[in-house]
């Protein structure tokens, strides 16, 4: 059974963790970083993911960022004449995380727990699950990000406590209130905003810089795609720097040009100015905080700990606003970038049976119901109901002799159906005509542990039943998913071949370099015919490299290795021969010395 990895699939960055020996561990990417940018780029038929994709975003218009904002919608991104759904782009990121997790673990990975914002609706959750399937992962559980963070924080805590998780991600904002005690993590309430995050903080800086430049030079940089990408990078960098310093320099030379020549953007942004620009965004996060407290029936005094999640919670003004609202300092003991993936890995351990005595009770973030007469939204399951759950209600017909009932399933909080999110529609047909108000139709909603909705309608008179697993208008059919899985596998195979080809070329280059070095060293020491053979093999490999024919490179590389090996053998033989000759010479000298006889002499005295 393969290990279950925990994945935080973020708007800006993603992170993957695994449970090893009962301890959660974040898996670093090939560049050695613990988080990976959620960026995908397409270049000359090749797919780039993560750091490499982000680095070339300025010059490559075929770069996709923040795709998570479009999950669960019918948005498509067109690249090189092909349209990609958010699920496919997300699957490319997941595939990359999966591949380096496999390299780290040394075994195939097929199972995962993937996190989503608590406020994600059914369509967004389903899209995330589909992305996992396309990437070749069996998604064991979809878990809410704040809940995962609470799991990571509270696993080793003994005392009972009420915690508030404030999760300000790259593109989404969530707040969840949980009660922790005896290994039970119970979500009491959740609230949020799916269109508020760190990207919006970057955007206020971009808008400010565009406005400044327009006033100074009369040029609108927002119309220039490449300039805009440079502004995005500068804004993100400035935002991060202003969490640690009170002012930062933004310098973008040659950002544009006019008839007088190139134009540069040079400005200083202070923390005070930045705080003024994003004040309305921080205030927007306070609405869901108050809502969650109200739904949980709690006051700020009832909160024991505040856990911060997401890179944007490092902004001092954000921390200050939370402290003002809740009257206490946020807890700084968790890494806001990694805590969600760690929680997902722990949940994976719970599913696999590696983590004992942990029970997770999550809630549905939005109310669920159906449209009834007059376009009214009738709720069957209220928001913040613990999941998994099931709820039934009996409805009847609105007209005489009605033989078909349309069931319009919705999610939201507004009183009128038209103002809420449609999850799907289906029909109950084939029951006998009867006066209005007579038929009894039981509608049952089931929400599973992933927060995914299943609905069935049953005519109690005939016991006829119709059921549906909600597929939103933006959802993918099974055929589409299978096609995308096949494409993803083919692309993974193509990526593997590309990597192998690059490695082969590197090995060939290295061999040519070492051969040239060896040829210089053996000059005059071995037979010239052997040297010539190696030189010809080296030139043949060079020619194959220029042609870029991989089979040819492989053959010529083997031929050169053989020639160099022969050269080494000859060199060794030559050296051995020389050593032998020297030894023989030394032995001969010793034999000559053997004829020397020691003589004794006696001194003769003349006066004898």
UniProtKB/Swiss-Prot annotation:
TM segment ranges: none
Region annotated Disordered, chain positions: 576-608
Composition skew (Acidic residues), residue ranges: 596-608
The protein's role, per its UniProt record: Acts as a chaperone.
Species, as recorded: Geobacillus stearothermophilus (Bacillus stearothermophilus)
Classification via InterPro entries: ATPase_NBD, Chaperone_DnaK, Heat_shock_70_CS, HSP70_C_sf, HSP70_peptide-bd_sf, Hsp_70_fam
Keywords, alphabetical: ATP-binding, Chaperone, Nucleotide-binding, Phosphoprotein, Stress response
Protein name: Chaperone protein DnaK
């Amino acid at each position: 059974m393969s290990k279950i990895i925990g994945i935080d699939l973020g708007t800006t960055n993603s992170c993957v963790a695994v449970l090893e020996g009962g301890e959660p561990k974040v898996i670093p990417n090939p560049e050695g970083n613990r988080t990976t940018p959620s960026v995908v780029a397409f270049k000359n038929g090749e797919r780039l993911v993560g750091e490499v994709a982000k680095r070339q975003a300025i010059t490559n218009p075929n770069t996709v960022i923040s795709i998570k904002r479009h999950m669960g919608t019918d948005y498509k991104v067109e690249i090189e004449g092909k349209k990609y759904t958010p699920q496919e782009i997300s699957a490319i990121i997941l595939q990359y995380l999966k591949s380096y997790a496999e390299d780290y673990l040394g075994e195939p990975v097929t199972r995962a727990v993937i996190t989503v914002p608590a406020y994600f609706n059914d369509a967004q959750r389903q899209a995330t699950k589909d992305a996992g399937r396309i990437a070749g992962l069996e998604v064991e559980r979809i878990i809410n990000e704040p809940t995962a963070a609470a799991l990571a924080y509270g696993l080793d805590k003994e005392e009972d406590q009420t915690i508030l998780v404030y999760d300000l991600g790259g593109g989404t904002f969530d707040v969840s209130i949980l009660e922790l005690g005896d290994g039970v993590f119970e979500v009491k309430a959740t609230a949020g905003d799916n269109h508020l995050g760190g990207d919006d903080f970057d955007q206020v800086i971009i808008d400010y810089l565009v406005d400044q430049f327009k006033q100074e030079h009369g040029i609108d940089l927002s119309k220039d795609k490449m300039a805009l990408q440079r502004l995005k990078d500068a804004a993100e960098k400035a935002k991060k720097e202003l969490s640690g310093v009170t002012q930062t320099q933004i310098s973008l030379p040659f950002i544009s040009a006019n008839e007088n020549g190139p134009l540069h953007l040079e400005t200083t942004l202070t923390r005070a100015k930045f705080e003024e620009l994003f004040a309305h965004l921080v205030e927007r996060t306070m609405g869901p905080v108050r809502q969650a407290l109200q739904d949980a029936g709690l006051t700020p005094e009832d909160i024991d700990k505040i856990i911060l999640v997401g890179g944007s919670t490092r902004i001092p003004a954000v921390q200050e606003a939370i402290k003002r609202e809740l009257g206490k300092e946020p807890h700084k003991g968790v890494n806001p970038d990694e805590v969600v993936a760690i929680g997902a890995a722990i949940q994976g351990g719970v599913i696999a049976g590696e983590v004992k005595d942990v029970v997770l009770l999550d809630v549905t973030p939005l109310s669920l119901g159906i449209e009834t007469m007059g376009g009214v939204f009738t709720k069957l399951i209220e928001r913040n109901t613990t999941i998994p759950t099931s709820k039934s209600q009996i409805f009847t017909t609105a007209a005489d002799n009605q033989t078909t009932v349309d069931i319009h399933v919705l999610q939201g909080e507004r009183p009128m159906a038209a103002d809420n999110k449609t999850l799907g529609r289906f029909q109950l047909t084939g029951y006998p005509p009867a006066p209005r108000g007579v038929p009894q139709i039981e509608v049952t909603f089931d929400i599973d542990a992933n927060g995914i909705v299943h609905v069935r309608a049953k005519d109690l008179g005939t016991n006829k039943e119709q059921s549906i697993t909600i597929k939103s208008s933006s959802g993918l059919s099974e055929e589409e998913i299978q096609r995308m899985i096949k494409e993803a596998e083919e692309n993974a195979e193509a990526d593997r071949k590309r990597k192998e080809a690059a490695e082969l070329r590197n090995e060939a280059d290295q061999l040519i370099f070492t051969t040239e070095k060896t040829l210089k060293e053996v000059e005059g020491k071995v037979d010239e015919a052997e040297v010539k053979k190696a030189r010809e093999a080296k030139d043949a490999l060079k020619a194959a490299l220029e042609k870029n024919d991989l089979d040819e490179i492989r053959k010529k590389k083997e031929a050169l290795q053989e020639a160099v090996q022969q050269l080494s053998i000859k060199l060794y033989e030559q050296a051995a021969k020389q050593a032998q000759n020297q030894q023989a010479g030394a032995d001969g000298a010793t034999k000559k010395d053997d004829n020397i006889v020691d003589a004794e002499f006696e001194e003769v005295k003349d006066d004898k």
